[in-house]
Amino acid sequence: MSITKSISTRRMSKGFTLIELVTVIVILGILAVFTLPRFANVTEQAHDASIQGVKGALASSVAIVHAQWVANGQPTADPNRDNLVGFGRGDIDVSAFGWPTSTNGSNNPSMDAIRCVEVWYGILQSSAPIVDTAGNVDYRVSAPGGDCVYTYNRDNSGSNIIYDADTGEITGNIF
């Protein structure tokens, strides 16, 4: 008798009942309702962190260009501020105050969008985000008032990084 009872008990304990399955599905649904908004916010935080990281990289690169300009014995009366020796490919042009302005021989700190693109690619590493004045790029470039404005294009928030070639200051707005 005990052998028969043991066999029938084993058969009964295989698998889940319908109530157990429904209970697990309900619990998973409740967890999804509470955790989904948290994970959705992670994407926005990732975009913000990306912008902050690029802003920091740009600020560091601008400071390194300026430090190299000072290390080269500037400021002096030497009007030639083209092709900064000792930095990158040697094609960075700087203003009278040692801030990067272009890679094509222009030292005027009042920037236009094309020169802003040149500065971006001239001072940042080759793995930097893609910038241009139009198109589907990481940052869209403009130069209102002579400052470089790099507007983040991946989340349509309008967040931006601003470079002032007069002072070397990097600021930004994250929305």
Question: What residue spans do the PLM features occupy?
Answer:
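N-terminal leader/signal peptides at the extreme start of proteins
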Residues: 1-16
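N-terminal signal-anchor/signal peptide hydrophobic helix marking the start
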Residues: 14-24
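Alpha-helical hydrophobic helix detector
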Residues: 22-37
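Conserved catalytic segment of histidine kinase HATPase_c domains, centered on the N-box/ATP-lid region
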Residues: 43
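Membrane-proximal N-terminal amphipathic helix
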Residues: 46-73
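Periplasmic/extracellular, small/polar-rich flexible segments of pilin-like filament-forming proteins
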Residues: 67-175
